[in-house]
Curated annotation (Swiss-Prot):
Residues 236-433 form the DH domain. Residues 920-939 have a biased composition (Basic and acidic residues). This is Rho guanine nucleotide exchange factor 2. InterPro entries: ARHGEF2_PH (IPR037806), C1-like_sf (IPR046349), DBL_dom_sf (IPR035899), DH_dom (IPR000219), PE/DAG-bd (IPR002219), PH-like_dom_sf (IPR011993), PH_16 (IPR041020), PH_domain (IPR001849).
Amino acid sequence: MSRIESLTRARTERSRELASKNREKEKMKEAKDARYTNGHLFTTISVSGMTMCYACNKSITAKEALICPTCNVTIHNRCKDTLANCTKVKQKQQKAALLKNSTALQSVSLRSKTTPRERPSSAIYPSDSFRQSLLGSRRGRSSLSLAKSVSTTNIAGHFSDESPLGLRRILSQSTDSLNMRNRALSVESLIDEGAEVIYSELMSDFETDERDFAADSWSLAVDSSFLQQQKKEVMKQQDVIYELIQTELHHVRTLKIMTRLFRTGMLEELQLEPGVVQGLFPCVDELSDIHTRFLSQLLERRRQALCPGSTRNFVIHRLADLLISQFSGPSAERMRKAYSEFCSRHTKALKLYKELYARDKRFQQFIRKVTRSAVLKRHGVQECILLVTQRITKYPVLINRILQHSHGTDEERQDLTTALGLVKELLSNVDQDVHELEKGARLQEIYHRMDPRAQAPVPSKGPFGREELLRRKLIHDGCLLWKTATGRFKDVLMLLMTDVLVFLQEKDQKYIFPALDKPSVVSLQNLIVRDIANQEKGMFLISAAPPEMYEVHTASRDDRSTWVRVIQQSVRVCPSREDFPLIETEDEAYLRRIKMELQQKDKALVELLREKVGLFAEMTHFQVEEDSGGVALPALPRGLFRSESLECPRGERLLQDAIREVEGLKDLLVGPGVELLLTPRDPALLVDPDSGGSTSPGVTANGEARNFNGSIELCRTDSDSSQKDRNGNQLRAPQEEALQRLVNLYGLLHGLQAAVAQQDTLMEARFPEGPERREKLARANSRDGEAGRVGPAPVAPDKQATELALLQRQHALLQEELRRCRRLGEERATEAGNLEARLRESEQARALLEREAEEARRQLAILGQSEPPPAEAPWARRPLDPRRRSLPAGDALYLSFTPPQPSRGHDRLDLSVTIRSVHRPFEDRERQELGSPEERLQDSSDPDTGSEEEGGGRLSPPHSPRDFTRMQDIPEETESRDGEPMVSES
């Protein structure tokens, strides 16, 4: 039993060992399968910290890494899935496929052994032009074994149209098998042939110069014996000039790599869209042309400065002229446009590159293979874009260093200073353009994120939609907190634009105008910005129309200072509402675009005329220099074509100057006494109105004859062609002066043409209102009428179209004038209706006052008949105060009342009252009651008079007709009270 148990136990242990070994083998197989990815057989190794990952180009800091012994690739464990297929496995598969294809073709190979075998490059490479441009020197050597391939041209030459169908099918299968090559393999074979060869072909034009500038500095590039002969200042200056040329050469190399290697490979090998490639490399062709030309000029100047018999030793003494020509004029404008576009799209280009690199494996493989070489390792796409962006910022530093170490002539230093100023101006313009382009792109982004139905009501202006944003320029934007009337804070996006402040609020990933208690569009007209006391982040925005105050808060104190500064600057330069309306209709927008196009055409016309006059003057000066031996003529005034400057001449002054030049030219050609009164009807005979006779155009006032037989004889003909003044100084020849006057006349006439064009555009763009417009229309109509009275003449079709356009424009102007007159008539009719209503009210008030006056006169008449005044002695007669009499109606008393004037010789007031009533019966009755002036006596005991003397105030007329009505009852009570004591006394 023990033996049986031992055997059983041994057998059990044996089975367990086999099971454990099988499990270990399965684990090893699973681990091996897990390491096997994309044809790579990865194994685990331990590496140092200096080993770089092939996939991500980063150092492998972990203790373990993966390596493929087939292709010797070391990567991170996490990067194995991103690695491309193993190249050795691909080559084995490719050789097997080609061997199979060649075996199938051997049965139908009809090519003779004497015929040389050709390489079917069109069937192998998908882009023949790219291979020819980059690998022309290596065309005879193939990277793949094609010894058993067939020439399609030779095969086709041995088969006619009557060949069997089976042979043709075999031929098509063989050629299709060659065309089925993967595009990624084509890229690999391209780069495997050597990036050095590609680079050498790219820089073939500057190969010699690149070797000459391989040293780090000028001191190391020249011979030591030649270096010891130079001064220290010259050595420093030449080092900087050498650095300028060397960095320019490197910059051209970077541009060529971007243009010829990356862009061409992406277009022809990867078959990317042209728009995508243009987004990666914007304006590289323009930049390459600009800097290649500049580098050629620098290298030519270096060759001119070489010492005789040497190819290394040189000293450049003159460089400022090249710098001025490069950074001024058309060249500077080209650089400004190219760098503005490139730098503004720098961020988008890098973002697009990262997206392509992350999602496209073929793109990853292309970039890795290109940058594998040592010469291109530091020239990836991102590095090249960054280098091109930073290049323009290096010029001011280099030129400033050259200027600091220049101790030569003053002219060179002055030119270097000018060049430095031009470079700084160019850099400032590029920065401004980049800022504007970035703000424009930001505005487009905001516009596309806005809700199309979003509108903000503007008081008395209408709705403000998102289309109004595109009319303006975005100056500044940012997120702020808007404090509402309830004390809550709302997150808003504030846009500072040309003439408005716009508040936007984000809702459902779209921008809308916030529906709050205040308008979300604020005009910059008379806008006031104030800081909030005791708050570092708050500020007030006080608007005038409508009068509102906004309280907003920024993220920091610096942001508030920035907002205050930019808002105040925008308020100072805010355009008026006449030039830039708040809300623009479609018709107004169309007219504005037309005006802008007209202004651009005027600028282009002025520029063309300026260039034309300059060429004419240059040609004339060249002819004069040849004839007179180097005598240069003065140039035209600089402000002739400057329409924006204050030196811009007016059309009238230009015309007067042109007439003066014509008269001077006439005096030079035919003499000062000849009157050129030629008419187109009879140019030979001219009648002098003073003498009544005929005068020939060749006879002067002194009777001297002039002959014009195809040439010009000047009025002063001396035996000696040279003329001298009284002091013996040489005078200018008449021919030179005539040519100079001709140049002046030519420039003045073209300047007049430019001024007239600009004036027409200005008058059409800004039509005056009222009589000036009617006068303009009348002048236009009179010109048309005079042109019509000249007589019928054949009119060209383009002229008919022009006249039709003019008539249509005049018709539109007349219609606009008619509408304006109608609006004016409606306003006048409304005013007339208001005046008529006021007139009716005044007539009613006048009738009421007349009725009250009649009633008062009737009461006075009744009172006078019932109570006659008692007879008194002359000494007891007292003068009546104006208040004690029956007062007439309100208007009559107000117009006739004269306050009493104090007399100098008496202590009492002389109450002489003069009453002029508009009612004649009332005035007669008043005279009867008061009596004659001789019978009036002064009453010094009147208490009312005494009170008036004590008061000393002037009597003021009543304020309203109601006061007059209330005062009419006063005289009756006074007379009744005065009558009682009179009766008692009597």
